[in-house]
Amino acid sequence: MDLKERINALNNVGVFLKNNCDKYAQNKDSILDKEIENSIKKAVIENQYFEKDNIMYALRNWGNILNTKNLNLFTNKYPINQKNHNVGIIMAGNIPLVGFHDFVCTFLCGKKSIIKQSKKDKSLSEFIFKFLNSLNEDFHNYIEICGERLKNFDAVIATGNDFSANQFRKYFNKFPNIIRQSRHSVAIIDGNESKDDLKGLSSDIFRHYGLGCRSISKIYLPKGYNLDVLFNSFYEWKNVINNSAYYNNYLYYKTIYLMKGDKFYDNGFSILKESEKIGSPIGTIFFEYYNDKTEINSLLKIKEDKIQCIVSNEIVKNSIVFGSSQTPSIEDFADKEDTMNFLLKLS
């Protein structure tokens, strides 16, 4: 397959996903493609935090990304070559299709993906790979799903938590690699946000139950900010508490805070707690007060190697708008490390 054929195949995936997601958006009881329905049912069983709404949200984003125009604009920025390499990809499983971007980049570069899937997110990507294979019989030359261990690879892209990332570095240190570890995302509020801004922030926090590296786990607030304003905007997401895994985490940390005598604010389904940390437990959102822009920039500088993205109304440079953290573009590389450049520099 040449680049044009690979782009066309991904475009067909995008059209297929978008058509089904449009159906679902119009009527959640719509009958979707049988293969999508089956993969969603399996995914919900695989991961207790996966549910149909969030899965469809992720599929819709990929449906919007995977179109010929986007993919041409994206690939035109790189000197795509046909050097053959096998790229091992170790995927995480915290949110739906979280490792799919690595596959897309590898496929666009004309290299073979040897994928170690997370047991918590297998069915969705397997369905898409099956769909791609139905479009072009040569697709099998570009992907291999491996078992417990990666074999016959020239480079590695691995995503995990801080502990597993350290293990990856030791194991793959002789190979070109991208090793990703835990990162978190933060929001900055100055008190001038609209209701829509705060509604968007709530989505950035609670979508996927706060499990993504782009999920907002910490909010920086101006001193004197009324926390009730935040809690009121959160209310639309009150049903997160109906997920038993989320509820158990929420209750566990609430109990810990009570036993330790920590100060916190509780609305019955989420907790606001003051902390200098940026990575908060599920069900808890950390906050920290700041005095001015100079101080907030200093605070962010200290934590920059642990921050994935920043949401604000242009309070700081390179921040994104409220409500957009869970809809990254194809150019939003995790950890700001250009996967395409990495792949194309392999010798």
Question: Can you say where each PLM-predicted feature lies in the sequence?
Answer:
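Hydrophobic packing residues within well-ordered alpha-helices of enzyme cores
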Residues: 125-128, 168, 230
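Conserved small-residue-rich beta-alpha loop and adjacent elements
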Residues: 73-135, 139
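Short hydrophobic beta-strand segments
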Residues: 86-90, 114-116, 154, 219, ...
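Donor nucleotide-activated moiety binding/catalytic core segment of transferases
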Residues: 76-94, 146-152, 164, 269-284
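NAD(P)-dependent aldehyde/semialdehyde dehydrogenase
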Residues: 208-216, 220-347
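N-terminal Rossmann-like NAD(P)+-binding subdomain of aldehyde/semialdehyde dehydrogenases
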Residues: 1-88, 287-293, 307-315
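Short, acidic/turn-prone active-site loops that include or flank metal/cofactor-
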Residues: 118-121, 181-185, 325-329
